[in-house]
A protein has these predicted regions:
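Hydrophobic, aromatic-enriched, well-ordered structural segments
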Residues: 1-219
Length: 219
């Protein structure tokens, strides 16, 4: 039972829509004390469907934990040496990522945008689109999601994945294909190769040896 509750919790946490969340949370309620605890914590603190704002699919603090791991030995050094190690690390990361962005040949970042969008292009091929009006379209997904509503004026889909990720979901992709609209135009600029390059365009310079420092006389 414990493993099942963990599975339902993970599915509930990652659900995009309230309806999908409720489906999994009802199963968690079989353990009343677990459901009560999760409700007291606040659904918006752990549920994607209830969260405020957009987290772009990020659900953990792995970035902070990864940096702590990289600096685990440097953290034992004096503060000046620790700062030097952090700067050297940033120099290395910025250089490597700028090179990756320069060599990128796709419109979107390969792993976080392009790969997802291409998979959704394949999924969209089996969907039927019905025009409701000039802005809204019903999309029939015969595989999983049933009928969903896409609104291009508000850049929204009733599955909510488009709004939260800022990347076209498979239903929006299907509508773009139906209208012969470039699907890449619906992706947030934060996924683009240009933004990736701009993010790492500046240079970070390592600290020079102490003997080369230009220290003002009044310091």
């Amino acid at each position: 039972m414990r493993d099942q509750i963990l599975m339902y919790f993970e599915k509930a946490a990652k659900s995009y829509s309230i309806a999908e969340f409720d489906c999994h949370f009802r199963k968690i309620k079989r353990k009343e004390h677990v459901a009560q605890y999760l409700e007291e914590v606040g659904l918006h603190n752990w549920s994607r469907a209830h969260m405020d704002g957009r987290r772009y699919n990020v659900m953990t603090t792995n970035i902070a934990e990864s940096i702590n791991s990289v600096l685990r030995f440097a953290r034992m050094m004096p503060v000046v040496h620790l700062i030097g190690e952090i700067i050297n690390l940033l120099v290395k990361w910025f250089t490597e990522r700028h090179e990756l962005a320069l060599n990128c040949t796709t419109t979107l970042c390969p792993n976080f945008g392009e790969k997802k969008l291409r998979n959704r292009l394949e999924d969209a091929a089996r969907m039927n689109v019905v025009k409701v009006n000039n802005a809204q379209f019903n999309v029939l997904d015969g595989y999983m999601d049933g009928l969903v509503l896409v609104d291009l004026t508000n850049n929204s889909c009733s599955c909510r994945k488009f709004q939260l990720e800022q990347l076209p979901c498979k239903h929006v992709v299907a509508v773009c294909r139906f209208l012969k609209v470039n699907v890449y135009s619906k992706a947030s600029r934060y996924y683009t190769r240009k933004t990736w390059m701009d993010a790492y365009s500046d240079s970070i310079y390592p600290i020079q040896p102490h003997g080369m420092w230009d220290i003002p006389e009044d310091v």
